[in-house]
């Protein structure tokens, strides 16, 4: 099994374990990132709620998640847990999130090249089934969501 599949299944496991904890506390589990890099591995959990997330919210969720992680022990390497709001450069994880932010500028990095490129920056036009539609200059790309490694909103300061 190649590393991308291992990371993907680990993320699914973490999502299934942690999202219910976040939701039970009254927050939305916006997304989870896990980067396994030896002693510097990072588990980042993004939470959101109506009206925004405060530092105290992150601390509450972090304490609960830490307890669950200590009991369940799903990560075999040493790691740092970080709980944060999605922030202005909001990461996008799900097809519903891409649909919600149609009309925004986005930056997308793919796991492997698509039509000769891995990086796309342009207008998020929306979604079509499991594809994310991005307009870069005068060309529209339909990017399969399962090829997306990382996607973020580019904030506008108009």
From Swiss-Prot:
Gene Ontology biological-process annotations: ribosomal small subunit assembly; translation
Keyword vocabulary terms for this entry: Cytoplasm, Ribosome biogenesis
Gene3D superfamilies: Ribosome maturation factor RimP, C-terminal domain, RimP-like superfamily, N-terminal
Main location per the UniProt record: cytoplasm
Cellular compartment(s): Cytoplasm
SUPFAM superfamilies recorded: YhbC-like, C-terminal domain, YhbC-like, N-terminal domain
Entry GO CC: cytosol
InterPro entries: Ribosome_maturation_RimP (IPR003728), RimP_C (IPR028998), RimP_C_sf (IPR036847), RimP_N (IPR028989), RimP_N_sf (IPR035956)
CDD domains: YlxS_C (cd01734)
Source organism, top-level taxon: Bacteria
Pfam families: DUF150_C, RimP_N
Keyword flag Cytoplasm: yes
Protein family per UniProt: Belongs to the RimP family.
Physiological role: Required for maturation of 30S ribosomal subunits.
Name of the protein: Ribosome maturation factor RimP
Species for this entry: Pseudomonas fluorescens (strain SBW25)
Name of the encoding gene: rimP
